[in-house]
Amino acid sequence: MRPLIAIVGRPNVGKSTLFNRIVGRRKAMVDDMPGVTRDRNYANVDRFDVPFILIDTGGFEPETNDRLLQQMREQSQLAMAEADVILFVMDGRDGLTPADVEVVEMLRRVDKPIFYLINKIDGDKQETAIGDFYTLGVDTIFTVSAEHNRGVNDLMDEVIKALPKGSAADTDEEVTKIAVIGRPNVGKSTLVNRLLGIERVVANPTPGTTRDSIDTYFTCNRKRYLLIDTAGIRRKGKTTEKIEKYSVVDSLRSIERADVVLIVIDAEEGVTEQDTKIAGYAYEAGRGCIFVVNKWDTLTKDNASMGKFIEKIRMEFKYLPFAPIVFVSAKTGQRLGKIMTEVDAVMEQFARRITTSDLNRVFSTATEEHHAPLYQGRRVKFYFATQVGTKPPSIVIFTNRPDGVHFSYERYIVNRFREAFGFTGTPMRLLFKGRESRKRA
């Protein structure tokens, strides 16, 4: 396992900017609105001598009556409990605050390496105006400017030295990456918390409470997974705030990172137009897909109700006939075990490779039983097929008229491959090439 480093501190002291600087890319949302990073956010960092996981937390307010800020405080405490090293960030422009002092007193009781940072120190003049911070009585204080990359490299040199030795980095290939997507407030965060057995993501009845995509590693039945709880994808017309627009982009990026996507649908509201668009993102990205119908416990059901809901999904999501459907209640835990069973099954098919001989046996039979329509009055001839990739399964078919294969015939070929080999839960990619490309296949 990679060692973990947690960044904690009051809201708006620059934690997310520091997170982005260390990661080397824009991973967390940065905005001037206090509390914009509501949950912990994880990123793998490989830029330094020791690979590690960096945790960005929501702002830490020691005493508050605001329920959301209280939840963010609890999440910060969980992050500190998980971490191997803690970076406590203070604001050099605001000066030392009573909240900073209270957090430092709490950190004194934590038995792990802690680095105290004064952020937003952009020059020597500011460096001389931070005397109050030295009254904290800590051994070393680092002055940095995360925005301008001042002092960050020196800080990281010392942080790397403090990381536990012998922590082997896990490669992405060893981990099944699962993205949880859906409209705001369909129960994604509650579902994630149930799967993990811990209040990992702030679950709040306010739609859009989860704004960033939140990453969590976990183990189930001796298999490792990375669970990505994405911000709810809203209609474009509703993403009026700059921060919400970035959340949609972040969710789409999370889909790109995933192997398997859980498409969460609200059983109470049924299938909406926005659900079909969200699922379309996953399909276009070529990810393994599973429908998770949540809040199934809230409906009055008869023996036919589940069948009717399945028919509705199949009708509205005609491009995903291969995706399994699981009916669950994240609130009660009903049928949640079925989700991981389906994830494993879909992942196996997502990464499946078929031998060229088996592929062509099915392909030849399919083309002989049903010829392709004529193209510009000429017959479309097929030569052979070969699988060139996985995740998703990708197959090249060599033909005399690569531009003459009708989409309906392409769908027919895909269906024949599915009948023979399964490929449950995963899209398939067919690429038609001219005969002259055969040697390059």
Curated annotation (Swiss-Prot):
EngA-type G domain ranges (all copies): 3-167, 176-351
Keyword terms, alphabetized: GTP-binding, Nucleotide-binding, Repeat, Ribosome biogenesis
Transmembrane parts of this sequence: none
Molecular function in Gene Ontology: GTP binding; ribosome binding
Annotated positions binding GTP 2: 182-189, 229-233, 294-297
InterPro entries tied to this protein: G_ENGA, GTP-bd, GTPase_Der, KH_dom-like, KH_dom-like_a/b, P-loop_NTPase, Small_GTP-bd
Keyword Nucleotide-binding: yes
Chain's role: GTPase that plays an essential role in the late steps of ribosome biogenesis.
Subunit-structure text: Associates with the 50S ribosomal subunit.
NCBIfam families: GTPase_EngA, small_GTP
Protein's recorded name: GTPase Der
